[in-house]
UniProtKB/Swiss-Prot annotation:
It comes from the Eukaryota. The keyword Mitochondrion does not apply. The gene is CYCP3-1. This is Cyclin-P3-1. GO terms for molecular function: protein kinase binding. Keywords: Cell cycle, Cell division, Cyclin.
């Protein structure tokens, strides 16, 4: 069952969560500049997880194993802005970000593997790409996703394969699990009210500086227009 766009169903006990997170907005009707709430809450959740893990690493309470997702330094772009960038250019359904969180947490079940500022951005873009390919009706190629994420196509391919093999290609998520993650993200609303504002993650990786690289944005926009033109020609 695809989860790209959810429809109203009074029998679905998670319907309110879907509405709250902005998962019911059809991608074809997404014509405003607002981002679905799921992006903000996911970013807050990932920010807190990263901070917690790095505090434990600094105190030598845990030991992190380097993975293919680890960069040499952290990107200047915050997780929130990175998630918004992915959503803006990939045109994936909002539900892909919930699936991405599920895939990320499954990946992190490996011993001594923790999400930090050196790995969170790559984990996020890769998980969203895998989710979009699995659940959405249309998606781009990895060369395009690589430009969106600020990495090379070769690296995008390798990251995707690594994630898939570590997940044992088990991408299907039942509605109960999906709904529970939606509820988990909803709880971040209270955390944002009580806790500090989302902090920018400074410092990581060899991902390109997307915050100041307008040429990458123009490339993505140009590619989007080309894909849209081809799609229209195919329908004529």
């Amino acid at each position: 069952m695809g989860m790209g766009t959810f429809t109203t169903d009074e029998s679905d006990k998670h319907e309110e969560s879907y509405l709250s997170l902005g998962l019911t907005v059809s991608q074809s009707k997404k014509n405003n500049t607002e981002y679905p709430k799921v992006l903000l809450l996911l970013a807050a959740y990932l920010d807190r997880s990263v901070q917690k893990n790095e505090d434990l690493l600094d105190s030598n309470k845990i030991k992190d194993s380097s993975t293919i997702f680890h960069g040499h330094r952290a990107p200047d772009l915050s997780i929130k802005l990175y998630a918004e960038r992915i959503f803006k250019y990939s045109e994936c359904s909002p539900s892909c970000f919930v699936l991405a969180l599920i895939y990320m947490e499954r990946y992190l079940q490996q011993p001594h593997v923790y999400m930090t500022s050196l790995s969170v951005h790559r984990l996020l873009i890769t998980s969203v790409v895998v989710a979009a390919k699995f659940t959405d009706d249309a998606f781009f190629n990895n060369a395009f996703y690589a430009r969106v994420g600020g990495i090379s196509t070769v690296e995008m391919n390798r990251l995707e394969l690594d994630l898939l093999f570590n997940l044992d290609f088990r991408l299907k998520v039942d509605l109960e699990t999906f709904g529970s993650y939606c509820l988990q993200l909803e709880k971040e609303t209270m955390v944002l009210v009580i806790d500090r504002p989302i902090q920018q993650v400074h410092g990581v990786n060899s991902t390109k500086d997307l915050s100041r690289n307008s040429s990458i944005d123009e490339s993505c926009k140009s590619e989007l227009m080309r894909y849209s033109s081809q799609a229209l020609q195919g329908c004529s």
